[in-house]
Amino acid sequence: MVIKPKIRGFICTNAHPEGCAASVAQQIEYVSSQGDLGSGPKNVLVIGSSTGYGLASRIVSAFGYGANTLGVCFEKAPSERKTATAGWYNTAAFHKEAKEKGLFAQTINGDAFSKEIKAQAIETIKREMGQVDLVIYSLASPRRTDPETGEVYKSTLKPVGQAYTTKTYDTDKDRIHDISLEPANEDEIAQTIKVMGGEDWELWLDALAEADLLAYGCKTTAYTYIGKELTWPIYGQATIGKAKEDLDRAAAAIVSKNQEKHIEAYVSSLKALVTQASSAIPVMPLYISLIYKVMKEEGTHEGCIEQIKGLFTERLFAQSPALDEQGRLRMDGKETNEATQAKIKALWDQVTQENFHELSDYAGYHHEFLKLFGFDVEGVDYEKEQNTLADWD
């Protein structure tokens, strides 16, 4: 069938197999063109491996360092009449490229929060990899089932403490408008921490340590976004921010429990980008459209793959990586520095319905959004019939 994007609200409900494969190939090509990346990981577990920063981490590990990779993700398979999710096609493309390079790659599809999927991952690592020397935690989910109690927790995107009114951009209706968000109650904050905090990251590391699958000196990192004043009320100082603070707690706990193995655990703060997660957050489409404009003009714009390649070479596997006062690895400085933020703030204050497309790089935002689902990718013929079926072997 010929596949065109079906957009509903902030998500695209279908995906393009060839477009996803082309996007993965572009990222692999970028990493392969970077030359020798130096010493790095050899056996990598990526939890949340199929899109965005998690997929980029898997690509850098495999094609930058020649590492064996095990991915864990939760994707919907295709049928003859319905496309799979983008992450399914990304993973199929990754497997094909890895196989051609003679690299070990396996992927487990299921709920990473569950005990069953952790057990499957442990069996696979024992059988195929021995031990892992890098664990990437890059999950984004709106809900989590507690593996002990079966209780379902749901995350909310709300400010903490007081109501918040600000500008936002409705991608569906192409309009700038004010949005008012009521503050979260204690239960909503607690549930968001359960879903998006560090508990599950810690449980993964506990399970791997118990099975003696963490190599001496193994590194692990969970990804976060910290941002600055413009996004703090909905991000840093909001329910998501509270959950992300819990990652700092988890990092310290992981290090403390695994001292004899010299395990290093970091929270890594990355720049704001169009991802399936960020497009769902109020304010972010407007903010990202503006930072794309400013950072492209400054020559500092980067996508997922450039950010992760930099994280690995300049921070995670550097001799003595620079840490912030909370002990985090920071890759967001080109966005969060005062000069860049001042330019974004000036645009933010000026932007209206009438001048939005002129002041922002919404065209760039929309292109990246479509690309998440395999659409608007350079060199792909979108009039060509597509086979929706794609496998991971």
Curated annotation (Swiss-Prot):
It is an enzyme of class 1 (oxidoreductase). It comes from the Bacteria. One of its GO terms (biological process) is fatty acid biosynthetic process. It catalyses: a 2,3-saturated acyl-[ACP] + NAD(+) = a (2E)-enoyl-[ACP] + NADH + H(+). NAD(+) binds at residues 48-53, 74-75, 111-112, 139-140, 244, 273-275. Belongs to the TER reductase family. This is Enoyl-[acyl-carrier-protein] reductase [NADH]. It comes from Pseudoalteromonas atlantica (strain T6c / ATCC BAA-1087). The gene is fabV.
